[in-house]
Amino acid sequence: MKHFLEELIIAALAWVPTVAGMGARLLLWRPLFKRCGKARFGTGIAMQGCKNMSLADGVRIGRGCQLYAEGGTLDMGEDAALSPGVTVDASGGLIRIGKQVAIGPGTVLRAANHCFDSLEKPIMLQGHLYGEIVIEDDVWIAANCTITPGTRIGHGAVVGAG
């Protein structure tokens, strides 16, 4: 029942427009998180596993972002920003995003990947491998990047096509 109520609260406020919608989302979504500072949430956001997410002050989640942390951990540092359409899926693993990190639109961070060791067995039947993604402070990840488990992006790095 608690999971249902969480999803209901998220869905009910996800598309409320204007500054009033942003305020309502912060006020009513904040208790769902493990920790949530003064964050800003755009419209159309989908989330599951909020109790495993920590968002510091100044975090900005753009419209249409998806955040998942069922059985995993998502930590976002101060002033980290997700542009519209970013997917962060920490389910089963860990994703740690540092301070002042900018992540471009359409980027996907996923703490799980398919196993593909066997040539005889279809990939879809080989299960998943879970791991960590660590993005240190002051990083810019450009649009439409995909970050998979086992990745560490160092302080001040820029990730994107030339």
List PLM regions with ranges.
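Flexible, glycine/small-residue-enriched loop-and-beta-strand segment within the central core
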Residues: 46-55, 61-151
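Terminal amphipathic alpha-helical/low-complexity segments used for targeting or macromolecular assembly
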Residues: 1-38, 100, 106-107, 113-119, ...
